[in-house]
């Protein structure tokens, strides 16, 4: 791309020669007044702070650019990078604890495989010690399942109550022409009762 050349003096004034645009088209030659500066050559205004920071060196005084090359840190001997001794010790403790829990869980599963459901009185005394904690840990999941069942029971009772109310309204004559959904609700009553019975027996 050709850039705008400086205005050329002719007999009647100055001209800016024709130039090529970035897209390949040509600008016409233009006649300009005395003292005209093309837009591309006008310096961009910079306030004093911008000028100060541009003139300011990036490095502190007296520091050579060679001294600022980044240094790659050497890896510490214990595989974890950047950890203190205490943090490494804590990691080792956690790892040992995790391995211990895995061993306890394996031992518990082996003893549970050996013991049948009918022989609950013959559970080894080894389970009474530290291995009783995995059983206690499973209690929250059991309680979550129990609360889930309780919610389902409550929901089913609510649906049954709605079905009974609908049936009473139909019998009282409040609803003369029940809609299709209402009839489906009435038809589902037996299924809801059976499901409620199953859940209550499961608790």
Swiss-Prot record:
The modification N-acetylmethionine is found at residue 1. Residues 151-203 are annotated as: eIF2A-like. The gene is Pym1. The eIF2A-like region shares sequence similarity with eIF2A and mediates the interaction with the 40S ribosomal subunit and the 48S preinitiation complex. Belongs to the pym family. It comes from the Eukaryota. Residues 122-131 have a biased composition (Polar residues). GO terms for biological process: exon-exon junction complex disassembly; nuclear-transcribed mRNA catabolic process, nonsense-mediated decay; positive regulation of translation. Residues 86-97 have a biased composition (Basic residues). This is Partner of Y14 and mago. The modification Phosphothreonine is found at residue 72. Pfam families: Mago-bind. It comes from Mus musculus.
């Amino acid at each position: 791309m050709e850039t705008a050349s400086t205005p050329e003096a002719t007999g009647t004034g100055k001209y800016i020669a024709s130039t090529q645009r970035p897209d390949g088209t040509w600008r016409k030659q233009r006649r300009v007044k005395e003292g005209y500066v093309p837009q591309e050559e006008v310096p961009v205004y910079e306030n004093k702070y911008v000028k100060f920071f541009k003139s300011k060196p990036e490095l502190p005084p007296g520091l050579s650019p060679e001294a600022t090359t980044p240094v790659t840190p050497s890896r510490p001997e214990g595989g974890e990078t950047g950890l203190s001794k205490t943090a490494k010790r804590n990691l080792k403790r956690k790892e040992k604890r995790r391995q211990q829990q895995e061993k306890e869980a394996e031992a518990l599963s082996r003893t549970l495989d050996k013991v049948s459901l009918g022989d609950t009185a013959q559970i080894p005394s080894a389970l009474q010690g530290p291995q009783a904690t995995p059983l206690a840990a499973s209690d929250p999941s059991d309680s979550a399942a129990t609360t889930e069942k309780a919610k389902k029971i409550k929901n089913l009772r609510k649906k049954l109550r709605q079905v009974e109310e609908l049936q009473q309204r139909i019998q009282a004559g409040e609803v003369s022409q029940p809609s299709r959904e209402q009839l489906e609700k009435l038809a589902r009553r037996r299924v809801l009762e059976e499901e409620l019975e199953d859940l209550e027996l499961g608790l």
